[in-house]
């Protein structure tokens, strides 16, 4: 009620918490009903103000994850999130899970997948990827990017490793690693914006149970080592609404045309 951030921790303490069916503020311990947004408890008040209310956001649960929709103009969500067999079936298990505070945006992180040239300078590929080897298609909220692995280690493998990336909006991304004999691991990336320049990214890596102790662990180690070099660049880069692109940059323009639907037009000016 006095402007505290319900997601960020306060100094020496924790952030907002779910308490029963309410969200508890870390600043004054007010409780807000999760369905209506109405204040239902103030520990030091005799009477709850009638207008004590915060906005309630559309929420769905998928595979143990709570996903919240935040539309650019306050609109309701126009699509649903997929149900993944890796979540709900018995064949796969979680090998790795982590949450990282980043000074970045969901837009920048997604654009990393189609910024082909940086895989040489930042990640150590020996040759620049060919744009024609990466396919990108979109329909509504969904974007599909498929192409060879961008990891230098993949060049040493005895098989061709293909990354199949599926975006469902900007905050829910799956990456399937195709071509590995006997398994197709899955990486789920979910991103929660905290403000215009900061977010929390959660990485969940699934492998089928038969290979979890071998391929799953190996891929997890290589995956995080491959992402770490991007962090300082994301932290210090600025958003360029109309970048000057060359023919070897990759499908950045196509990615941005798809991503515009999730932002107000003022964000691109």
Role assignments for model-derived ranges:
Residues 74-269:
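C-terminal catalytic domain of Rieske-type non-heme iron oxygenases
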């Amino acid at each position: 009620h006095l402007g505290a951030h319900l997601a960020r921790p306060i100094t020496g303490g924790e952030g907002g918490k779910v308490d029963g069916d309410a969200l508890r503020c870390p600043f004054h311990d007010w409780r807000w009903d999760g369905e209506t947004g109405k204040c239902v408890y103030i520990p030091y008040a005799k009477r709850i103000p009638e207008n004590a209310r915060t906005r309630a956001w559309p929420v769905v649960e998928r595979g143990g994850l709570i996903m919240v929709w935040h539309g650019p103009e306050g609109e309701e969500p126009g699509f649903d999130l997929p149900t993944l067999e890796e979540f709900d079936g018995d064949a796969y298990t979680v090998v790795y899970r982590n949450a990282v505070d980043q000074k970045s945006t969901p837009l920048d992180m997604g654009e990393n997948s189609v910024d082909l040239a940086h895989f040489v300078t930042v990640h150590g590929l020996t040759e620049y990827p060919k744009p024609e080897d990466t396919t990108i298609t979109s329909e509504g909220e969904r974007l599909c990017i498929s192409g060879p692995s961008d990891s230098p280690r993949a060049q040493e493998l005895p098989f061709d490793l293909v990354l199949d990336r599926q975006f469902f909006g900007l905050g829910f991304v799956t990456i399937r690693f195709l071509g590995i004999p006997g398994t197709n691991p899955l990486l789920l990336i979910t991103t929660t914006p905290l403000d215009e320049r900061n977010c929390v990214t959660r990485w969940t890596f699934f492998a089928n149970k038969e290979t979890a102790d071998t391929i799953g662990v190996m891929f997890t180690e290589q995956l995080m080592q491959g992402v770490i070099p991007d962090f300082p660049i994301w932290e210090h880069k600025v958003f360029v609404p109309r970048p000057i692109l060359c023919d070897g940059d990759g499908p950045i323009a196509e990615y941005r045309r798809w991503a515009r639907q999730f932002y107000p037009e003022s964000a691109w000016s």
